[in-house]
Amino acid sequence: MPDSSLMVVFTQVTGPREGWRQRAPKEILKRLPAAQQDIPEYDMTGLVQENLHLRSTDGGETWARFSSDTFSSAMNGYSEGSVVVLADGTLLRAGWGQSLTYCDVRPTGFLQRSTDGAKTWGSPEYLSPDTNLQTFPTRIRRLRDGRLIITGGAAPFDPDNWQWMNQLPKTHHCMWVCNDATGKLWSDPLYVTDEAEFACEEWDTAELGNGDLLAVFRAIIYDNTGKVTKQDRRQTILVQNGQAWTAGSISQTPFPHDGHPELLRTREGVILHVAPTALSWTADRGQTWTRLDCPGTGYYPHATQLEDGTILAVGHVGNDDPYGKTDQAIVLNRIRLEVR
């Protein structure tokens, strides 16, 4: 944060676990993922939903509730929790309008700003002006030269006639680049896996010393009926080419899919792959990965390294669970690297 404190944000949903539960209207349910349609416990309609911000001023030892912003949706959230601090101290986060089933927003990805340290957030700023492109931004990163990149996915769609399950096999990994320090002027999507046999919007990057990007993708393969047949993780090097990047050949990784990839370039020079199953590092642009002798993280982790070298990784217990099945507690891993 601008004041050197730490902030973590997550989605919290509360309400009755048993008894009466409201269901979303059929015209809304028909657009949503199969789980929300078929399993009432995945429908969050009628529950109290909020993005909850916790703040720490002692390096993550203790946390206090700082602020929250509420929303209402049949979905279990609308933001992957990626927030970046701009040069002027403004916070910028990404969200999905397609997940805000009860709000007057376009069904596509957008950005929001906070100029008061996450106490309040501004109106949606849509990532793409193309009303027939549905975007899924998941990560915002600041590069060493000050530029910003957003990674996620996108797919063409009819905003008046679309269904989530039909979009998934068409959604390919892409990125948006901003040369403006205010984070307002974004490029068209740069697709990096559009010729691949897999789809998804979840991927992350780590900047290499020469400006190239090491990228790790969650890769989902669908059959002709839209059924998932395989999931794993792939990787590539995005070679810097002026103000953009060109994707190299895509190869397998030694990792299971494990949800959203998370990469962290460390002060020690290695890049960490942070995941629930394990933490692994590479010093050769991803050609080899070495597993660390330490526990994995919570699901869908976010990681950062403090000035003293401590690495904090925050995730949650459980998976993409129905409401009330699992206490999806937020957990934190504290890690220090030892160079030998």
State the predicted function of each range.
Residues M1-R340:
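Asp-box/BNR beta-propeller blade signature and adjacent active/binding-site loops
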